[in-house]
Amino acid sequence: MQYLGVEFNMKHTPKLDPGFIPFGVWRAAYLKEAKQPVAIAVERDKGRVSVHHTCIHGTPAMAEADYRYMERYVKFLLWSTGGFRVSICGCSEIAQRLQKAYTPEGERHFDFTFVNQLFERDLEILDLPLEECPESNEVAQPIGGYMDGCRIGFDAGGSDMKVSAVVDGET
């Protein structure tokens, strides 16, 4: 199959959605020929910054594929990591398109509005040279471990199902 100039193979085509393209499959094929380094830095609360280095093709023929790859990557990072400031480092054309996409009227208006409400501040997309990419500032912090109250866990595994109930840390 081919999408935006990138050839990729799928083992199975979904019968109910034959036009579906799994991003992971397309991404792997896209990255094989991508050589121009770029970075995405996502800033969130307390000055924490996640930096992700990757590559794009950087040619006019692959401009749409480059944009789609970076647009999907930014959306993934906003939903998985969270943040209110995204720096696109190393490709002004993509940064400028993303600045238009993440507006109240843009193609990513839902994400823009959601992030604004979540962080109580406007989502910013910055255009920076690669050498001015913010430095990573990650802080490990423990999660979970709450033993008081009632909890139920459910695992719908491939071959079996498991259920666990805990009250104040006791099964």
What are these regions (language model features)?
Residues 1-151:
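Nucleotide/phosphate-binding catalytic cleft detector across ATP-hydrolyzing
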Residues 139-169:
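Gly/Thr-rich phosphate-binding beta-strand-loop-beta motif of the actin/hexokinase/Hsp70
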